């Protein structure tokens, strides 16, 4: 019997699920808004909430734990330097899930998962150029 089992399996092994949520969390932190299936968005939310709470702590051990989870130092840098100060006063609830209709190919429910007070100008390559220019101006 499957009583008390909280998370979905997504027809993947444990290692594949862990890697999938690590990649989805990294994409969400990078872009601050992603479109994915509704079940993945619902299971991604606690992963990202825990990472932001970890970043709010801000110590070296928390940073190393985040690197172990996300596997990318640049994403962890954004998490600790941009998102943690933004949500310093918020006691949880850093993300929202908005239903986004159904996918054409297989009619699965889609959803947008985003940060609550996200930067609406953070979009793709233009955002990388914008943040790089801002960092360069700050350094000069």
Curated annotation (Swiss-Prot):
Protein keywords: Ribonucleoprotein, Ribosomal protein
Molecular-function GO terms, alphabetical: structural constituent of ribosome
HAMAP family, per database record: Ribosomal_bL17
Family (UniProt): Belongs to the bacterial ribosomal protein bL17 family.
PANTHER family, per database record: LARGE RIBOSOMAL SUBUNIT PROTEIN BL17M, RIBOSOMAL PROTEIN L17
Assigned GO CC terms: cytosolic large ribosomal subunit
PROSITE patterns the UniProt entry points to: RIBOSOMAL_L17
InterPro entries: Ribosomal_bL17 (IPR000456), Ribosomal_bL17_CS (IPR047859), Ribosomal_bL17_sf (IPR036373)
Pfam families with a match to the protein in the record: Ribosomal_L17
Subunit and interaction comment: Part of the 50S ribosomal subunit. Contacts protein L32.
Protein's gene: rplQ
GO biological process: translation
The protein's name: Large ribosomal subunit protein bL17
Superkingdom of source: Bacteria
